[in-house]
């Protein structure tokens, strides 16, 4: 069995999303000690910003106008899609950046859509865990309720468009204890961290059995 893991944090060494994904992966590996893990880290190895446009434009160009840059982009799109489609289970670690989806993760989505768009849902029925973290609080009743424009979008793409069997693991207030203005939330943040760890353990166990 093969687990595909994608990380997107721009701070890999201190990433809260990667730490939770580590917990999910550990539970999966405990159940599948002989399983393989395919990894891609978009934070440390981002997709070139022009890759999607090059791959897409190549569809509309005559053969004599297709350059090596177009071919490289097409090959990368095929490689990314093949990684995903070879997976028996998927683990995505995607933090919230500036209230939305980070550009490097959006580029990955666009490249997958380029290759699989006409071939049916990319993750139909595949057990998938989405780990997402947010530095502040965005829940009901908070001053920034509704400012998280990432999670609804990702849920729409993964569960509705790609038809993944999706489980969501979330953690908020990750900047409490880092930003002085959030010190009053440190106790709540610690509680949310504990809950997120427990949710990640449960998600990992479930991922291993589905």
Where are these regions (language model features)?
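Structural beta-sheet core signal
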Residues: 5, 92, 128-132, 168
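Active-site donor-binding loop signature of nucleotide-sugar glycosyltransferases
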Residues: 42, 133, 171-173
């Amino acid at each position: 069995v093969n687990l595909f893991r994608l990380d997107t944090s721009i701070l890999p060494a201190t990433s809260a999303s990667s730490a939770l994904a580590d917990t999910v992966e550990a539970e999966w590996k405990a159940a599948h000690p002989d399983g393989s893990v395919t990894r891609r880290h978009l934070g440390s190895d981002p997709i070139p910003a022009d890759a999607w446009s090059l791959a897409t434009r190549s569809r509309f160009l005559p053969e004599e106008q297709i350059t090596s840059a177009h071919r490289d982009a097409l090959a990368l799109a095929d490689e990314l899609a093949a990684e995903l489609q070879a997976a028996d289970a998927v683990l995505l670690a995607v933090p919230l950046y500036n209230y939305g989806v980070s550009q490097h993760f959006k580029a990955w989505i666009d490249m997958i859509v380029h290759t699989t768009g006409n071939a049916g849902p990319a993750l139909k029925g595949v057990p998938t865990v989405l780990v997402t973290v947010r530095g502040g609080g965005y829940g009901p009743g908070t001053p920034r309720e509704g400012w998280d424009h990432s999670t609804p979008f990702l849920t729409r793409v993964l569960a509705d468009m790609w038809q993944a069997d999706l489980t969501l693991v979330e953690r908020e207030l990750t900047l409490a204890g880092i930003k002085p203005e959030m010190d009053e939330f440190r106790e709540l943040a610690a509680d949310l961290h504990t809950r997120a760890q427990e949710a990640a353990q449960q998600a990992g166990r479930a991922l291993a059995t589905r």
